[in-house]
Amino acid sequence: MASLRKEIATRARAEDVWDAMRDVGALHTRLVPGFVIDTRLEPGARMVTFGNGTMLRELIVTVDDRQRRIVWSAVGGLLSHHNGSAQVVEGPNSETKIVWIADFLPDQASGAIERMMEEGLAAMKTTLDRLAENV
């Protein structure tokens, strides 16, 4: 099973970052606009439409307010297994770190998944840095 870990830092406050991340039905407006263009909530899940046209159903495993961590599992697409998590970590000097981990099969999808994660994190950083400027 392949595993990727990516992280970014932002000037946005950790509580504001977590508020946007935990809003599981608003990826396309509050966290990664452009990377995700639509999010529709279903019982225990969300249907996510990415900017490249890919649609996936993501089962929401947990939204942990104490740890500021969300876990989901993607269903559909080219992967036979996908488990993702994202965590908001308060850092030094008013900086907030976001850690995104993806575990998936088949291993051969690593390149494509890594590119998607990098694109998603770039959109997230832009959105969150803009949020920091408006506080």
Task: Tell me the role of every PLM-derived stretch.
Residues 11-15, 62-66, 88-97:
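A short, structured loop/turn motif at beta-sheet edges
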Residues 10-12, 50, 74, 104:
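Short beta-strand-to-loop capping motifs
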Residues 2-4, 54, 68, 82, ...:
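Residues at beta-strand starts and edge strands
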Residues 25-77, 83, 119, 133-134:
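Glycine-rich portal/gate segments that line the openings of hydrophobic small-molecule binding cavities
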Residues 1-42:
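Hydrophobic ligand-binding cavity/cleft-lining segments
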Residues 75-127, 134-135:
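Beta-strand/loop substructures that line and gate deep hydrophobic ligand-binding cavities in soluble
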Residues 7-11, 49, 59, 87:
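Generic structural detector for well-ordered beta-strands
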